[in-house]
Amino acid sequence: NRIEQMKLEGVSFECNVKIGEDISMNRLLKDFDAIVLACGSEQPRDLKIPGRDLKGIHFAMDFLTRQNKICEGDKIEIEPEFSAKNKNVIVIGGGDTGSDCIGTSNRQGAKSVTQLEILEKPPAKENKMLTWPNWPLKLRTSSSHEEGANRNWSVSTKLFNGQKNVESLTLKKVEWKKNEEGKMVIKDSQGKESEVELKADLVLLAMGFVHPIKDKLIKDSGIKLDKRGNV
């Protein structure tokens, strides 16, 4: 057990502690010679488009953590609005978090699961001469995908449609092209067939994270943030 090993090496762990509320940053600065901030990026990227305030649209982590607690043995019930059972689920985002949402939705008994990705579909095999030493760009299919999911690439979500609850999404097919400076830019495709509407009862936003949560820890530590809110 890695934690037990670290304890034997002299590391002490204090769980369920929120810096700025349970312990002040001033106390840490006074009691310790050095402080390492390893909080990660916790603020999820939002999709602020018309209809975002409809019910049934959630950040991926709010959906996944509830299931994780059940898997750990916690006796809790998932609220109906967070359950994928018998629902048409749409996952926006093509990364690992999106893959976790697919697997969890299938296990909860989703009626259908569709994953949307704004980027182009990657090649089946990477071009090692072009990608090395960077992370290779190639199509990745997880065990969650193999369990069942529709995967759509090069689409941008433009509207969440519905009355009180989300009922469908309006999508626009997009194209990636190089501009005069040689940078890849995104443009909406034209024509009637470029716009698509998909049914949705539950939408999970899995588009990555933008920066640390700007709580009392960040403020009291006095660290500088850039224009995007990153350390």
PLM regions with names:
Residues 74-110:
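Rossmann-like NAD(P)H-binding beta-loop-alpha module
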Residues 43-45, 64-66, 121-125:
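Short gly/pro/ser/thr-enriched loop/turn and capping motifs at secondary-structure boundaries
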Residues 3-50, 158-180, 200-204, 209-217:
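Feature captures the FAD/FMN-dependent oxidoreductase FAD-binding
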Residues 16, 85-88, 154:
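Phosphate-coordination loops involved in phosphoryl transfer and adenosine-cofactor binding
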Residues 139, 145, 169-191:
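Active-site rim loops that border cofactor/substrate pockets in soluble metabolic enzymes
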Residues 1-4, 13, 102-159:
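Rossmann-like dinucleotide-binding cores of NAD(P)H-dependent redox enzymes
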Residues 53-86, 178-231:
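FAD-site-proximal beta/loop scaffold in flavoenzymes
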